[in-house]
């Protein structure tokens, strides 16, 4: 797996017949929003009431399209270049 696209976790098990092109990492969250709503303003009116809503939020990291693979790097692929910093001092 070192030189392959390791976009999925190593613990992922594929079921037979499952489409491998549609796999990705799926994370889902719920955002809960509580609001206090009142009617009538200062002069009276109806009592306040609470309103709660849960909003589903799904984050997905899909497999990159064919041709946009991440390239594995090894120590032989890394090129180190050294640059020297030139100090420019102006005299007044």
Swiss-Prot record:
One of its GO terms (cellular component) is synapse. Gene3D superfamilies: 2.60.40.640. GO terms for molecular function: opsin binding; phosphoprotein binding; protein domain specific binding. Retina and pineal gland. Keywords: Cell projection, Disulfide bond, Sensory transduction, Vision. It comes from the Eukaryota. GO terms for biological process: endocytosis; negative regulation of signal transduction; signal transduction; visual perception. The keyword Disulfide bond applies. It is found in: Photoreceptor inner segment; Cell projection, Cilium, Photoreceptor outer segment. InterPro entries: Arrestin, Arrestin-like_C, Ig_E-set. Homodimer; disulfide-linked in response to retinal illumination. Interacts with CXCR4; the interaction is dependent on the C-terminal phosphorylation of CXCR4 and modulates the calcium ion mobilization activity of CXCR4. Interacts with GPR84. PANTHER family: ARRESTIN, ARRESTIN-C. Belongs to the arrestin family. May play a role in an as yet undefined retina-specific signal transduction. Could bind to photoactivated-phosphorylated red/green opsins. This is Arrestin-C. It comes from Rattus norvegicus.
